[in-house]
């Protein structure tokens, strides 16, 4: 078979011309064609939002396949597993289309082979690849192939804490313990523990792990800044230049201010005013000192310049003219503060070096000890696996050359989110001229994962300036958004983003351009809107915005009712007037927390709202916290916090007044007693203030105490699972949370708590005390458990974080809480790290001598060392740049219309920013000083001509947000004609049938529980195990007498129908009879269907195309075909188990539908034909059964890795659910 060669540049140019003049409705852009067909060199594709980068990657891969490059000879890295699966699906679809289009048998066979190879090709995350590499070559480092990944943060934290504690004790007992103690106190301050120091150690460790060689970075880079910045001459030139530039700009701003007509330069007598003379002196000095800095001061006298400036300028930042404040001195004052105490800093800085050396030593020792502990467990973090892979590729030249010769091309998606560790790995896999990198620096928003956008930026500049090093291709056409969204985005970022703040200059190389004529059609009603809730309130003489500023200062940044009402009003208008489906609307928020008001208000207005779910907030959900405090109280009633929380909860609803009355019931004056003891005193009327306990309160306490004691007694003889459900049922708590705004999620959380308690007791750990201890350990390490996933209604408004929305698109987008301050906590951290400069710390200095405070034993003061200040400046710019990119990602999600919503005082915000600009950008100092999205937008709107901005700003008052203004949702009846079609009986008969059907369904659903024998021998299965074992596909060998629990319903003239169970049984048999080969055909399925023992009416109900799609469209189906020689079906098993309570043995027997026996793992699968609502429901129903199957196979074959899957066949299409 002959393959076509790759296109040269002239052929690519001709193809671009042909495409341009062609008649296709959707044409590829010249840049897309160039990115698809260019070959033989490194390529960086800068793909703006919505520019079709995934399309380009798929087309490029397919083109290479058609030119004879096997898909197994490409390394294709994606950012997420989901992205990898989507890419595989697209490739498979294109290959299938290719098979149908060609008549060449050889080409058909080749493309079919390529389709089969997708499952085995290196298409996935870098983590997946490094695990594969380590499985093959880990022996070179002494790593056994059966290692596991420590994905649970709680497990990581527990092991880290154990290593830290041991190492800490060793250092405290060492001969350098005094230096170490000073180091710990430097970070712990007045705290009586070392938690603050431990946090900094973990922070350094985490940061170092993102480098290609953590130990090397700690040894060579960690102390670079500390060693470098020891004197005035060591100060970075850019720091001095920033001060001098600020002096010049301050002089210009002050001159412009004095030239205002309302300034008043002269008195009535015609003489200059004192203020004018003073300001002229400042202007002259600022210009003179900045111009002659080297001759007047120089670096060695920078501290004196700062003192002179402090004497020259006012201490405040504003100049008031005609009642208007102008922040003329704001920027220069912030710059001066860095140098004012420079001499003092340089005096004390040498004292930090011994502490930093000790810190360096401790972190290196911790890193090594932690790695050794993980090796002993044969369990590693993802970063460990990558470092091992890098070490193997660096040290083993033969292995490195195998990979470099194997891969025709090394492709990576989302390149802007790479860290230096990943970049090193890609370089090792590449031969130096076969890299293909796709990304967009404007969408780099994962700095918290140590992603470094400068990796992308350096490549961008290098290829732009040196084309011989690689080709730069720009994809600027946006195929997602209408012009109104594109224009607003360009307007914002052309004035906001440059290399100084934002990492790149947002110029013609990065402007978004509409990719189709349809997008260029103008819809003025869809212009971008910034809607700000006006917080100006004159009631009580207090400004609501001032109170809001206070709340923000305290970190309580929640959505206000006004903002939510603006949102609701517009959503109702869109839905009612423009018939916009709720599912076309998405709300973007900065974090998952503090959004309860959204759900509450939407619930009030009958607007369906679903969340993206999120992760690791489970233990902090209110309903779970209530239950955990209940369990803590049962375990130990003397736990005051838990007991009061339980009493205050909806289960017992004691109010604050009642709790205060109980708190006064000490048995003796001056005696300290627990709250539960005071409860008992209240019940026995033995308290000091018994008269405060009313009869109503006494009755309420009696009910509480009875319930608590009943639960305590029950907990001693029953499982945790049973105890939790007893609490739910006794106090109707499960039903109560069903009335909350997030009822479905809340009930799922409570249900999951019972399941997790059940799973916990299957381990070697048992009992309430240990369960509570485990939960508290997780919370103490500031970790959590994953949230429970729910099937979400399709027709609902979506709310998700901006990070979660990346890569997605929505018709209408609302960006909420735009006035929320950026998180700057890292900038005020005791320690700041830089990859290039190393560490900078705040130093706890004793300035007693400096202040001549001889009468005091010591005067401790935190000083920001020079390395700290330099790193702080770098970190602040990096944080602001990432916030700009976050706003870019949020704005570019919208297809039709974009809204941004915030709040603030119209009076204060309308004239907050002056009209000063730097070319087409807001002044750098202004951009650095702004701390929220809203102020960036306001500043742009006030500085630049609003006609050219493509977005409007409107303040909305309470008068516009009344109930009548907001409106309401009108609902249509949910009753469909089809529901009434066969209703030919009287209402009474219909009701009777419904009742009998319901009874029968309940009998069938709870058949196992009803049929439990009332009298059992010790050898029979204990009740505790019944919910686990007595499930579909698992038979318990125990004699039991049983009474039938089903009865036949009278037919009431119903026509005979094929039951779903008959269809399910036939479908199940069909799947077992299909002959599995490397390629299951439709003919194979037809032949198998003829062997099924079922009536023709039943077989007519089976969709054979659904069965075929399982083998063609699902990864599991393809895997079964690829490994058909390792497939086992209808495999019986028997397993002996011991009941831990009675020590009696019992046998479990069952039949496994099928499994693949591979060298390193077993892939177990089971067909389920039940009707179901959500895959999660089926997973919860059958996960225990699958766990038993897995345990049996694990013991039989001595293979620890078992992947379990349910093949759900109860709907129109087959779904695969992992149960591992």
From Swiss-Prot:
InterPro entries for this protein: AddA (IPR014152), DNA_helicase_UvrD-like_C (IPR014017), DNA_helicase_UvrD/REP (IPR000212), P-loop_NTPase (IPR027417), PDDEXK-like_dom_sf (IPR011604), PDDEXK_AddAB-type (IPR038726), Restrct_endonuc-II-like (IPR011335), UvrD-like_ATP-bd (IPR014016)
Gene Ontology MF annotations: 3'-5' DNA helicase activity; 3'-5' exonuclease activity; ATP binding; ATP hydrolysis activity; double-stranded DNA binding
Residues where ATP binds: 47-54
Cofactor(s) needed by this chain: Mg(2+)
All copies of domain UvrD-like helicase C-terminal, residue ranges: 519-807
UniProt entry tagged with the keyword Manganese: no
Bilayer-spanning residue ranges: none
Spans annotated as Disordered: 533-559
Main function: The heterodimer acts as both an ATP-dependent DNA helicase and an ATP-dependent, dual-direction single-stranded exonuclease. Recognizes the chi site generating a DNA molecule suitable for the initiation of homologous recombination. The AddA nuclease domain is required for chi fragment generation; this subunit has the helicase and 3' -> 5' nuclease activities.
UniProt record similarity statement: Belongs to the helicase family. AddA subfamily.
Protein name: ATP-dependent helicase/nuclease subunit A
Gene source species: Streptococcus uberis (strain ATCC BAA-854 / 0140J)
């Amino acid at each position: 078979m002959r393959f076509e060669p790759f296109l040269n540049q002239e052929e690519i140019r001709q193809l671009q011309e042909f495409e341009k003049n062609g008649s296709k409705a959707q044409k590829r852009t010249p840049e897309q064609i160039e990115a698809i067909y260019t070959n033989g060199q490194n390529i960086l594709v800068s793909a703006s939002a919505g520019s079709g980068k995934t399309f380009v990657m798929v087309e490029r891969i397919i083109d290479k396949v058609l030119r004879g490059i096997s898909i197994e000879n490409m390394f294709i890295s994606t950012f997420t597993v989901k992205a990898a699966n989507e890419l595989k699906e697209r490739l498979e679809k294109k290959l299938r289309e290719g098979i149908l289009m060609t008549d060449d048998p050889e080409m058909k066979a080749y493309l079919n082979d390529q389709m089969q190879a997708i499952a085995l090709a290196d298409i996935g995350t870098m983590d997946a690849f490094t695990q594969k590499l380590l499985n093959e070559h880990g022996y070179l480092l002494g790593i056994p192939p059966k290692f596991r990944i420590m994905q649970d943060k709680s497990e990581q934290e527990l092991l880290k804490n154990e290593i830290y504690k041991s190492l800490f004790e060793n250092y405290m007992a060492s001969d350098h313990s005094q230096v170490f103690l000073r180091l710990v106190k430097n970070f712990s301050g007045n705290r009586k523990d070392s938690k603050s120091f431990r946090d900094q150690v973990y922070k350094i460790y985490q940061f170092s792990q993102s480098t290609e060689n953590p130990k090397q970075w700690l040894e060579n880079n960690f102390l670079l800044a500390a060693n470098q910045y020891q004197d005035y001459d060591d100060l970075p030139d850019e720091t001095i230049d920033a001060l001098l530039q600020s002096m010049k700009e301050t002089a210009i701003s002050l001159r412009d201010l004095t030239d205002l007509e309302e300034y008043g330069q002269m008195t009535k007598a015609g003489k200059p005013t004192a203020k004018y003379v003073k300001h002229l002196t400042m202007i002259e000095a600022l210009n003179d000192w900045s111009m002659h800095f080297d001759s007047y001061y120089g670096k060695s006298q920078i501290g004196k310049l700062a003192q002179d400036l402090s004497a020259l300028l006012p201490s405040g930042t504003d100049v008031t003219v005609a009642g208007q404040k102008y922040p003329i001195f704001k920027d220069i004052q912030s710059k001066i503060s860095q140098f004012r105490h420079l001499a003092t800093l340089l005096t004390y800085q040498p004292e930090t070096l011994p502490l930093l050396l000790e810190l360096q030593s401790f972190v290196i020792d911790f890193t090594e000890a932690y790695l050794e502990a993980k090796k002993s467990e044969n369990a590693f973090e993802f970063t460990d696996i990558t470092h091992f892979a890098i070490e193997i590729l660096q040290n083993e030249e033969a292995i490195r050359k195998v990979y470099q010769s194997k891969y025709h091309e090394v492709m990576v998606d989302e390149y802007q989110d790479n860290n230096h560790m990943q970049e090193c790995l890609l370089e090792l896999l590449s031969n130096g001229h076969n890299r293909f990198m796709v990304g967009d620096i404007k969408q780099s928003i994962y700095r918290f994962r140590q992603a470094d956008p400068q990796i992308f930026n350096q490549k961008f500049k290098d290829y732009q300036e040196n084309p011989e090093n690689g080709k730069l291709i720009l994809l600027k056409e946006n195929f997602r958004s209408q012009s109104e969204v594109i224009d607003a985005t360009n307007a914002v970022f052309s004035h906001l983003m440059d290399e100084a703040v934002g990492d790149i200059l947002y110029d013609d190389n990065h402007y978004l351009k509409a990719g189709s004529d349809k997008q260029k059609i103008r819809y003025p009603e869809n212009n971008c809107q910034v809607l700000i809730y006006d917080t100006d309130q004159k009631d009580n003489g207090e400004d609501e915005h001032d109170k809001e500023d206070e709340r923000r200062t305290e970190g309580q940044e929640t959505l206000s009712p006004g903002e939510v009402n603006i949102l609701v009003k517009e959503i109702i208008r869109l839905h009612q007037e423009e018939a916009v489906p709720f599912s076309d609307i998405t709300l973007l928020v900065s974090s998952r927390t503090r959004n309860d008001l959204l759900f509450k208000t939407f619930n009030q207005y009958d607007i369906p709202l679903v969340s993206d779910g999120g992760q690791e907030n489970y233990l902090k959900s209110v309903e779970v916290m209530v239950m955990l405090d209940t369990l803590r109280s049962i375990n130990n009633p003397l736990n005051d916090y838990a007991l009061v929380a339980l009493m205050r909860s909806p289960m017992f609803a004691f109010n604050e007044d009642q709790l205060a009355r109980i708190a006064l019931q000490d048995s003796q004056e001056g005696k300290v007693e627990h709250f539960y003891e005071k409860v008992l005193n209240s019940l026995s009327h033995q308290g000091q203030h018994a008269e405060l306990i009313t009869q109503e309160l006494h009755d309420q306490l009696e009910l509480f105490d009875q319930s608590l004691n009943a639960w305590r007694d029950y907990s001693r003889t029953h499982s945790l699972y049973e105890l939790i459900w007893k609490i739910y049922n006794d106090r109707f708590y499960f039903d109560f949370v069903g009335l909350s705004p997030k009822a479905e999620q809340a009930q799922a959380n409570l249900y999951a708590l019972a399941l997790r308690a059940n799973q916990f007791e299957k381990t070697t750990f048992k009992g309430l005390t240990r369960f509570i201890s485990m939960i508290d350990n997780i919370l103490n390490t500031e970790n959590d458990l994953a949230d429970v996933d729910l099937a979400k209604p399709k027709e609902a408004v979506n709310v998700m974080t901006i990070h979660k929305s990346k890569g997605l698109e929505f018709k209408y987008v609302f960006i909420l809480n735009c006035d929320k301050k950026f998180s700057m906590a890292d900038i005020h951290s005791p320690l700041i790290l830089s990859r290039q400069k190393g560490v900078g710390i705040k130093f706890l200095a004793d300035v007693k001598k400096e202040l001549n405070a001889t009468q005091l034993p010591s005067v401790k003061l935190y000083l920001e060392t020079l390395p700290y200040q330099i790193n702080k400046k770098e970190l602040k710019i990096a944080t602001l740049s990432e916030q700009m990119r976050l706003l870019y990602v949020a704005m570019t999600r919208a297809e039709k219309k974009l809204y941004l919503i915030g709040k603030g005082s119209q009076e204060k915000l309308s004239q907050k920013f002056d009209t000063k600009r730097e070319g087409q950008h807001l002044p750098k100092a202004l951009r650095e000083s702004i701390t929220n999205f809203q102020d960036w937008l306001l500043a742009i709107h006030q500085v630049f001509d609003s006609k050219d901005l493509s977005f409007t700003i409107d303040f909305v008052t309470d008068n516009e947000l009344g109930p009548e203004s907001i409106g309401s949702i009108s609902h249509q009846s949910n009753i469909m004609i089809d529901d009434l079609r066969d209703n030919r009986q009287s209402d009474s008969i219909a009701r009777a049938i419904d009742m009998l059907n319901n009874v029968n369904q309940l009998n069938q659903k709870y058949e196992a529980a009803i049929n439990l024998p009332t009298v059992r021998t010790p050898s029979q299965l204990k009740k505790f195990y019944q919910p686990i074992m007595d499930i579909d596909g698992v038979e318990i060998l125990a004699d039991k007498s049983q009474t039938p629990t089903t009865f036949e319903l009278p037919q009431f003239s119903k026509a005979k129908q094929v039951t779903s169970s008959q269809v399910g049984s036939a479908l199940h048999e069909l799947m077992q009879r299909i002959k599995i080969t490397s390629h299951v055909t439709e003919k194979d399925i037809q032949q198998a269907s003829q062997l099924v023992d079922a009536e023709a009416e039943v077989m007519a109900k089976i969709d054979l195309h659904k069965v075929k799609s399982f083998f063609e469209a699902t990864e599991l189906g393809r895997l079964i075909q690829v490994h058909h020689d390792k497939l086992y079906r209808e495999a019986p098993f028997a397993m002996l188990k011991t009941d831990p309570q009675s020590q009696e043995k019992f046998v479990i027997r069952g039949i496994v539908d099928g499994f693949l026996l591979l060298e390193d793992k077993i892939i177990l699968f089971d067909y389920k034909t039940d009707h179901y609502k959500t895959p999660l429901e089926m997973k919860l129903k059958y996960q225990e059964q699958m766990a038993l199957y897995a345990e049996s196979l694990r013991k039989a074959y001595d293979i620890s890795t078992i992947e379990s899957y349910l093949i759900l066949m109860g709907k129109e299409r087959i779904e695969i659910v992992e149960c591992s």
